[in-house]
From Swiss-Prot:
Region feature Disordered, mapped onto this chain: 23-61
Its job: May play a role in fertility regulation.
GO CC aspect terms: extracellular region; mitochondrion
Native source organism of the sequence: Homo sapiens
Keyword Plastid assigned: no
Gene3D superfamilies the UniProt entry points to: 1.50.10.10, Glutaredoxin
InterPro entries registered for this protein in UniProt: 6-hairpin_glycosidase_sf, 6hp_glycosidase-like_sf, Ssp411, Ssp411-like_TRX, Thioredoxin-like_sf
Cystine bridges: none
Location, primary (coarse class): secreted
GO biological process: carbohydrate metabolic process; cell differentiation; spermatogenesis
Protein name (Swiss-Prot/TrEMBL): Spermatogenesis-associated protein 20
Protein localization: Secreted
Keyword Secreted: yes
């Protein structure tokens, strides 16, 4: 919308405070650029004011955040700032005292959130300014994604990007007029310090308040128009073939041939893109583009797994790579990355049969089970990037994960027998993983000099090349490296651990249920499926209100590992319902326990009541009541680090239609896809997960029915055959012969399907017709993957 953009450009009167973004999950140009402030506003603000300095003896007096449950809010509970949580008390105070609201949004494992808390929010003078001249509100973006999305939309629309911490100044009516990300405490030659920002906004609020209010209203009006997503006068979604090809072309243009991935730096894991490429390969596998799509996805996954973005010692993946080579990561570990990447590597194994990918998937889930799992079955949110190198020292990014040559030599001094030259286990490991005496981290990736002389493990050579270099057997090298990594892992346990965000989110737990269910099904490992089952039980026991049928967004780890909730509870958002429903559908297909399918249908009904836009189509991110007062009610239109909840919902609706035959689900899916038509036509690469749903909707969904006893060996053999083949556009149904069962009541045709000669029997049904009965898993595989 050019008119809105033009207006937004006119109100940007602040000089740019820096060249890049604050620490952002969507990306930033480098660690160095992360440090620059991004500012957008309607307030003129010259650079070069007086700096401010943190107090050397901050008083440990708690503010009202001490009563919150969020780990992020509790990190600010001893700031000399009169913080309020998001809520009516803060809004009433702002209106009564006619003060602007200072809104600061972040999350507990955010590196630059820690920096700003230490540099600015612990500063006594800044604390007085924030407490006396503003109503200061602190928000955990993971608790309130609706608040985060609304004001991030403003920051991104009025500046060069966004990130966290996000700092926005609002009118008492919650309309934004100044926004930015990380601010340094002091002014620099090209950067505006936070104290200067506060003083200038205070001055402008006193002298030019009416102008600020008018500008704020115009910006809000422009954002409302710009964020409109609606069916309009369109009757149907666009052609899937056209949108698919355009999406592939856009990805192909940005693909890194050498290292994989789709950007220079920083490089983020992109599971939604990889899933799209796998689906594109399946529908174009006899074409050159199809082969290329598969190669792009598999190469990216292999380079990521070999790079430093993967924790080779403790498993799991870090948040993103600061360089093109996937070498030096931002060391934070997020639950949603582990969940989605486990699925991506499992799919890669389905496609390729290469156990390299299944081993990576198993490693991810091993990490989650060990480090991100609550004893009752739920999953924690994240581990921080920062930790003290030694107890009592100041935290540094990556300290827990990096190694010096001296450390490795001391831990692995054993000689390697049979090598063509004198060699220790440590030297073998350092050669394979690229460790050097000077450290293997470029100064450009370490602007603060915290990682000098340190090494990030990254695979430099194949096992075959390392073995050949020293005249060793490949399996012997594999054993030696695995043994060495285990010793490093045991030694690492004695280091101070990074902060664990033990908050549990329904949405991310739903993704993790999918991660365990899909991987367990593909690999035929009931142990992994049991983790998914326990996760679903946790969601139902601790994050579901039976009386209202609603999900809760959050719960927290209390003393002794107990599960606690905020009072009042934080109710679920669209993504909580969409991701949990997906997890339950995946769990049903993995376990064939119909109770999970029944719960998924009930949650989908609740989602429709709370979030569906009956006029424009698609789902709003938040309930109307919960988001009351916010200037925007948005529909998420981008598949990023997490898939858009609308994209996931489109898939869920298709699958629910396949499981039940109810036409309403299909009609809703078509309406949703139609509402996002323009976005998919223009920039399909922004919605690859929704483009997959569009393709699935315009193809024929397969209903694969297995008639048999759930626990029988022949039934399990047919089920495992289905899971071994990559078939994204299908539902797997178990028909146990009970006419009163849930699925038999939903799909009457199941009663017409019979077991052949009292054996478990498979039918592949599409377009209201079923294949001949099949009892041989090999024959079924041929039919599913000709």
């Amino acid at each position: 919308m050019l008119g809105a953009r033009a207006w937004l450009g006119r109100v940007l009167l602040l000089p740019r405070a820096g060249a890049g973004l604050a620490a952002s999950r969507r990306g930033s140009s480098s660690r160095d650029k992360d440090r620059s402030a991004t500012v957008s506003s309607s307030v003129p603000m010259p650079a070069g004011g007086k700096g401010s300095h943190p107090s050397s003896t901050p008083q440990r007096v708690p503010n009202r955040l001490i009563h919150e449950k969020s780990p992020y809010l509790l990190q600010h509970a001893y700031n000399p700032v009169d913080w309020y949580p998001w809520g009516q008390e803060a809004f009433d105070k702002a209106r009564k005292e006619n003060k602007p609201i200072f809104l600061s949004v972040g999350y507990s494992t955010c590196h630059w959130c820690h920096m700003m808390e230490e540099e600015s929010f612990q500063n006594e003078e800044i604390g007085r300014l924030l407490s006396e001249d503003f109503v200061s509100v602190k928000v955990d973006r993971e608790e309130r994604p609706d608040v985060d999305k609304v004001y991030m939309t403003f920051v991104q629309a009025t500046s060069s990007g966004g990130g966290w911490p996000m700092n926005v100044w609002l009118t008492p009516n919650l309309q934004p007029f100044v926004g930015g990300t990380y601010f340094p405490p002091e002014d620099g030659l090209t950067r505006v310090g936070f104290r200067t920002v506060l003083l200038r906004i205070r001055e402008q609020w006193k002298q030019n308040k009416n102008t600020l209010l008018e500008n704020s209203q115009r910006v809000t009006t422009a954002l409302l128009a710009r964020s409109e997503i609606s069916v309009g006068d369109r009757q149907l979604p666009p052609s899937a073939a056209t949108v698919n090809n355009r999406c592939f072309q856009q990805l192909d243009e940005g693909y890194d041939e050498e290292y994989g991935g789709f950007a220079e730096a920083p490089k983020f894991p992109t599971p939604v893109i990889l899933s799209f490429l796998f689906s594109y390969w399946l529908s174009h596998r006899l074409t050159q583009d199809g082969s290329r799509a598969q190669q792009m996805a598999l190469h990216t996954l292999k380079m990521m797994a070999n790079g430093g973005i993967r924790d080779h010692v403790g498993q799991g993946f870090h948040r993103y790579s600061t360089d093109r080579q996937w070498h030096v990561p931002h060391f934070e570990k997020m639950l949603y990355d582990q969940a989605q990447l486990a699925v991506a590597y499992s799919q890669a194994f389905q496609l390729s049969g290469d156990e390299f990918y299944s081993d990576v998937a198993k490693g991810i889930l091993q990490y989650v089970a060990r480090s991100l799992s609550h004893r009752s079955g739920g999953f924690y949110s994240a581990e921080d990037a920062d930790s003290p190198p030694e107890r009592g020292q100041r935290p540094k990014e990556g300290a827990y994960y990096v190694w010096t040559v001296k450390e490795v030599q001391q831990l692995l001094p054993e000689p390697v027998l049979g090598a063509t030259e004198p060699l220790t286990s440590g030297q073998l490991l350092m050669k394979h993983y690229g460790l050097t005496e000077a450290g293997n981290i470029s100064p450009s990736q370490d602007p603060k000099g915290e990682l000098q002389g340190q090494n990030v493990l990254t695979v430099r050579y194949s096992l075959e090349l390392t073995a050949a270099r020293f005249g060793l057997d490949v399996e012997a090298v594999r054993t030696l490296l695995n043994s060495g990594l285990e010793k490093l892992f045991q030694a690492r346990k004695h280091r101070p651990k990074p902060h664990l965000d033990s908050k549990m989110l329904a949405a991310w737990n739903g993704l993790m249920v999918s991660g365990y269910a899909v991987t367990g099904a593909v690999l035929g490992q009931d142990r992994l499926i049991n983790y998914a089952t326990n996760g679903a039980k946790f969601l139902k026991r601790h994050m579901f209100d039976v009386a209202s049928g609603r999900l809760m967004r959050t719960c927290y780890t209390g003393p002794g590992g107990t599960v606690e909730h905020s009072n009042p509870p934080c109710w679920g958002f669209l993504e909580d319902y969409a991701f949990v429903v997906r997890g339950l559908l995946d769990l049903y297909e993995a376990s064939q326990e119909s109770a999970w399918l029944e719960w998924a249908l009930r949650l989908q009904d609740t989602q429709d009541k709370l979030f569906w836009d009956s006029q424009g189509g698609g789902y709003f991110c938040s309930e109307a009541e919960l988001g009351a007062g916010l200037p925007l009610r948005l529909k998420d239109d981008q598949d990023g680090a997490e898939p858009s909840a609308n994209s996931v919902s489109a898939h869920n609706l298709l699958r629910l239609h396949g499981f039940t035959g109810h036409k309403d689900w299909m009609d809703k899916c078509v309406c949703l896809l139609t509402a996002f038509s323009e976005r998919m036509r223009r920039v399909p690469v922004a919605l690859p997960e929704m483009v997959r749903a569009l393709s699935a909707q315009q193809q024929t969904l397969k209903q694969i029915v297995i008639c048999g006893d759930r626990q029988a060996k022949d039934t399990k053999a047919l089920v495992q055959c289905v899971h071994s083949v990559y078939i994204p556009n299908k539902v797997l149904i178990l028909a146990d012969g009970d006419p009163s069962s849930f699925l038999s009541r939903q799909l009457p045709f199941l009663s017409t399907l019979r077991r052949l000669e009292d054996q478990a029997t498979a039918y592949v049904c599409e377009n209201q017709a079923c294949s001949v009965p099949i009892t041989d898993p090999c024959e079924l595989r041929k039919l599913l993957h000709p």
